[in-house]
């Protein structure tokens, strides 16, 4: 399917011309207010847009499009309404693109024919018998008459086109003011266009049948069952124009007097030719939907005819009858009740369409949301199962990993109460980290540094539990490790330090605690049979809490080859109590 522009005089279609030079935009079928504005702008007679109806971008102003990038398609604003149409060409070519010139030629020829009979009769009455008797004068007189008639027809056709264009521009500006403007224009140009009225009425009555100039035929008032919306739409165009006129602010104007149209109809002997007066009398009644001024008669003394709209029901009953002349104010007053009825019919018509489309859209949205909700529930259930599995693994890891005996205690239980026996060593409790790194020296070793973590705790027994874990400062590789217990002799300051080291050495050190300082020395040392040499023979330790609240430890050592020499010094910062 090739997308084409729905405007009457537009030949743009998809694929024609350069790419993105012309874009196509669908009619807003779901927005009744905008759709009415689009239809009024397009002004196509007896036509209803579908979902395959489009308008090209040449019928919109530049400010009707949203600002986008150059490589993106044009996007209309939500309030955009088409306004660029060649309405003069449309009015003259309403019958079709190929018949425009033929219709204009037929109208001009009809006007010449209408005046040729009268001019011939007047010429025959004033012509001398001598000239009629001369056979050579007849061809010359015919040529003179034809030249005169053609000279008159040319300015009349131009004048008619100009008047139609002015009337159409007035209707485009405001539907309500267009009525008064057209009436004033018809009164001001009554005498100038009196001759053209009969010819144009005769042509429209012959070619149009029962369809008037506004494009509203009698089929609109007697639609079939499937064309109810089309019928109500045509009624709404009348309702909207009348309602718009009523809602405009009242401007003091001179009242328009009711004037009767003179019916000087003289029966003609010829059945094929129609005079100007007869053509006016037999022209179809003015449309009840759009008020258009009637052309005055040829007689210079005849007053200009007024606008003659009728209600829709009266127009249906009197199909070929003359319209009763009414003023603009009477039209507005008489149509006020009809406007409400037509508005209600139109709202029902469009609401029924919208309700169906809205129900379909809502149904699709509900199904889409249900699908999304279902997928979310599945994700939540999967997440819950994963959380349960992770919780089970975590519980299992907690049961398996028991770094300290205190971890066996329930976390909900309160910490155990300290035994009064170990109260003098309470300043050593807590978790300590070396800050700065510890330093190690010995005559047989290169100086080195290390990081160390110390845990000293109690479980309510008359002793303290300790562990010393050292690491390489750069690689964090585990190094020396030892753990054990610190006991106090009740009611004394005597302390015993029992330690087991990963080097295969077990030692017992004893000493005394004085305030916040503990000094101990090795009492007995045991080692495994395959321990490395040189063997340790004596160890001394000194713990103290300095003024900054940091714990210091100094270790001295004597081996089989070296006397007692300071080996380690480290300062700890308390991390947890």
Curated annotation (Swiss-Prot):
Enzyme Commission identifier(s): 5.99.-.-
Binding site for heme b: 444, 567
A Pfam family hit: THAP4_heme-bd
ZnF (THAP-type) residues: 1-85
The protein's annotated pathway: Nitrogen metabolism
Biased composition (Low complexity): 157-170, 290-300
GO molecular-function terms, A-Z: DNA binding; heme binding; identical protein binding; nitric oxide binding; peroxynitrite isomerase activity; zinc ion binding
First-listed, main subcellular location of the protein, grouped into a coarse class: cytoplasm
Any one cellular-component term (Gene Ontology): nucleoplasm
Bias type Basic and acidic residues, positions: 247-266
UniProt motif (HCFC1-binding motif (HBM)) ranges: 235-238
Self-association state and partner proteins as the record states: Homodimer.
Domain comment, as recorded: The C-terminal nitrobindin region coordinates a heme and bears the isomerase activity. The N-terminal zinc finger domain likely binds DNA and may be involved in transcriptional regulation.
Protein name: Peroxynitrite isomerase THAP4
Gene name linked to the record: THAP4
């Amino acid at each position: 399917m090739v997308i084409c522009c729905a405007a009457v005089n537009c030949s743009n279609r998809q694929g024609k011309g350069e790419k993105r030079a012309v874009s196509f935009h669908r009619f807003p079928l779901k927005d009744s207010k905008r759709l009415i504005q689009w239809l009024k702008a397009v002004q196509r007679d007896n036509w209803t847009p579908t979902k395959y109806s489009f308008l090209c971008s040449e019928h919109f102003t530049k400010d009707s499009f949203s600002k986008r990038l150059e490589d993106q398609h044009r996007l209309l604003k939500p309030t955009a309404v088409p306004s660029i149409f060649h309405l003069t060409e449309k009015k003259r070519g309403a019958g079709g693109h190929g018949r425009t010139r033929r219709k204009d030629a037929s109208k001009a020829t009809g006007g010449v024919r209408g005046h040729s009979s009268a001019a011939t009769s007047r010429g025959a009455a004033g012509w001398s018998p001598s000239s009629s008797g001369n056979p050579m004068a007849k061809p010359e007189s015919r040529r003179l008459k034809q030249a005169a008639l053609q000279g008159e027809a040319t300015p009349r056709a131009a004048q008619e086109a100009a008047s139609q264009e002015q009337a159409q521009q007035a209707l485009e500006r405001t539907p309500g003011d267009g009525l008064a403007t057209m009436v004033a224009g018809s009164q001001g140009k009554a005498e100038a266009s009196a001759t053209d009225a009969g010819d144009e009425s005769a042509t429209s009555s012959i070619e149009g049948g029962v369809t008037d100039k506004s494009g509203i035929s009698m089929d609109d008032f007697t639609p079939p069952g499937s064309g109810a919306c089309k019928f109500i739409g045509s009624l709404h165009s009348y309702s909207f124009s009348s309602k718009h006129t009523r809602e405009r602010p009242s401007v003091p104007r001179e009242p328009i007097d009711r004037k009767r149209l003179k019916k000087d109809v003289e029966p003609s002997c010829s059945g094929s030719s129609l005079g100007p007066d007869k053509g006016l009398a037999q022209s179809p009644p003015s449309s009840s939907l759009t008020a258009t001024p009637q052309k005055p008669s040829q007689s210079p003394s005849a007053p200009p005819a007024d606008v003659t709209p009728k209600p829709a029901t009266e127009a249906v009953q009197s199909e070929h009858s003359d319209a009763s002349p009414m003023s603009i104010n009477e039209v507005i007053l008489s149509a006020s009740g009809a406007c409400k009825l037509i508005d209600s019919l139109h709202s029902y018509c469009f609401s029924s369409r919208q309700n169906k489309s809205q129900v379909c859209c809502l149904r699709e949205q509900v199904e889409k949301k249900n699908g999304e909700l279902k997928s979310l529930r599945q994700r939540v259930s999967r997440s819950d199962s994963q959380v349960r599995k992770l919780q089970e693994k975590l519980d299992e890891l907690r049961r398996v990993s028991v770094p300290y005996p205190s971890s066996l205690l329930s976390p909900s239980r309160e910490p155990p109460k300290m035994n009064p026996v170990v109260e003098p060593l309470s300043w050593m409790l807590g978790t300590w980290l070396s800050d700065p790194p510890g330093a190690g020296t010995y005559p047989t070793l290169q100086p080195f540094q290390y990081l160390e973590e110390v845990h000293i705790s109690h479980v309510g027994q008359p002793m303290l539990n300790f562990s010393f874990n050292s690491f390489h400062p750069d690689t964090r590789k585990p190094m020396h490790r030892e753990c054990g217990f610190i006991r106090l002799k009740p009611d004394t300051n005597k302390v015993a330090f029992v330690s087991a080291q990963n080097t295969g050495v077990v030692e017992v050190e004893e000493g005394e605690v004085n305030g916040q300082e503990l000094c101990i020395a090795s009492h007995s040392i045991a080692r495994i049979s395959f321990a490395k040499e040189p063997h340790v023979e004596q160890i001394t330790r000194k713990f103290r809490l300095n003024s900054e609240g940091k714990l210091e430890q100094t270790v001295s050592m004597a081996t089989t080859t070296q006397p007692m020499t300071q080996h380690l010094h480290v300062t700890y910062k308390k991390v947890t109590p």
